Amino acid sequence: MELPLGSDLARLVRVWRALVDHRLKPLELTQTHWVTLHNIYHLPPGQSQIQLAKAIGIEQPSLVRTLDQLEEKGLITRHVCAHDRRAKRIMLTESAEPIIQAVNGVISHTRSEVLFGITPEQVDELALLVSRLEKNILALHENQA
């Protein structure tokens, strides 16, 4: 009997994010907000909305509402790209810095707690296996196209 690996991985991501989300409640950020801010921070500066949507794994139109909300909070700015007037570049504002630091701190601390009792070698092996799974899935998608 095969193990439900896909379901197990999806559940793991869901409960991990829920834990981080609970710990970030004092910042009054929704999960969508902190995931978006976290991704903007870790991508090279000035990414386009399309690139950000791909990094998060959502459709670009779904991202627009979240970006509107983050812009209203003064955490990001969007600028029209000089090379493609249809594209918008996203930048974090100075006021986002303390929030980003708090989010990163909670994520890092939670990661340490979640990985308690797991050796660095085991974490590396898990990361390698997950990367291989992703590569296989992407190859299957390309073969379907």
From Swiss-Prot:
It comes from the Bacteria. Residues 49-72 bind DNA. GO terms for molecular function: DNA binding; DNA-binding transcription factor activity. Disruption phenotype: Pleiotropic, with decreased production of exoenzymes such as pectate lyase (Pel), cellulase and protease Prt. Has a 50% decrease in potato macerationafter 96 hours. Dramatically reduces transcription of carA, the antibiotic carbapenem biosynthetic gene. Transcription regulator that can specifically activate or repress expression of target genes. Regulates genes involved in production of antibiotic and exoenzyme virulence determinants in the phytopathogen. Required for the expression of the virulence protein evf during Drosophila melanogaster infection. It comes from Pectobacterium carotovorum subsp. carotovorum. Keywords: Activator, Antibiotic biosynthesis, DNA-binding, Repressor, Transcription, Transcription regulation, Virulence. This is Transcriptional regulator SlyA. Residues 2-135 form the HTH marR-type domain. One of its GO terms (biological process) is response to stress. Belongs to the SlyA family. The keyword Transcription regulation applies. Homodimer.
